[in-house]
């Protein structure tokens, strides 16, 4: 750069610093790029699939899927993991449906969880913005986008048309929120539901998420949660097998996926993941129905082995560390169909 250009640039940078504060514009080479902090999801496989050990701090995250697929369970695990390391968390319960007893079972410190049950969408999003601006809250969960009903719709008569109101509300709120959460280091997680596109035919998925396209654009991470099987013991349902696809990821390679068990009343089965990934990585030996580790038997059958690991936390932690150290892309990578990527460009 010649001297005249350098002088002009230096003058411009001084004017910007004076107007907006020192460090508003930085040259990347002047400062070491720091790794992105994360909050664990509570799932070993999903943490690795996300590429940075969990969901990124200071970003907007969308978790979506059909009803009863495990979306709220996943967010409660995020809250529990954040609280374990001293994080302050808030739950904006727009659906007025939070099960406090279930949250406790998952490890959430409900006594120190801030909760709000707003009357309408604008109030909910104002609460989220105010909490984020405080800089004191690490994680905010909104359950759910579909329940963020605009005030005019609530106060209107049944049958009134309110086309696009919620989409405009979300678009306006996210434009304001994105910069705030990044500056303050607050993670904001939106739970969203799936709807069928009206008149969808031919190419592409007939599914879409509620609240318009703004959240798809502003979210740094989008997780698609699906139930793939019901877990049974003696013909009695005891949980669900769930697959989570990372369909968008701005902080690590996308399109990875993870599978894990969600047990009724207990949440994500970490012991089940330890066995699954331990066997895949040859850390745990499987011979017939027996599972063993380091020449010691864990149990006969998956459920008995899970019970052993739950009772022997030191062994479970040891295997977990080996899994995290040895987990490779070959296990976690899973291509997402092009039609499922639609709208994420």
Swiss-Prot record:
Its main location: cytoplasm. Gene3D superfamilies: P-loop containing nucleotide triphosphate hydrolases. One of its GO terms (cellular component) is cytosol. It comes from the Bacteria. It is found in: Cytoplasm. Disulfide bonds: none annotated. InterPro entries: AAA+_ATPase, DNA_recomb/repair_RecA, DNA_recomb/repair_RecA_CS, P-loop_NTPase, RecA-like_C, RecA-like_N, RecA_ATP-bd, RecA_C_sf. ATP binds at residues 65-72. GO terms for biological process: DNA recombination; DNA repair; SOS response. GO terms for molecular function: ATP binding; ATP hydrolysis activity; ATP-dependent DNA damage sensor activity; damaged DNA binding; single-stranded DNA binding. It holds the Pfam family RecA. Keywords: ATP-binding, Cytoplasm, DNA damage, DNA recombination, DNA repair, DNA-binding, Nucleotide-binding, SOS response. HAMAP family: RecA. Can catalyze the hydrolysis of ATP in the presence of single-stranded DNA, the ATP-dependent uptake of single-stranded DNA by duplex DNA, and the ATP-dependent hybridization of homologous single-stranded DNAs. It interacts with LexA causing its activation and leading to its autocatalytic cleavage. Belongs to the RecA family. This is Protein RecA. It comes from Campylobacter fetus subsp. fetus (strain 82-40).
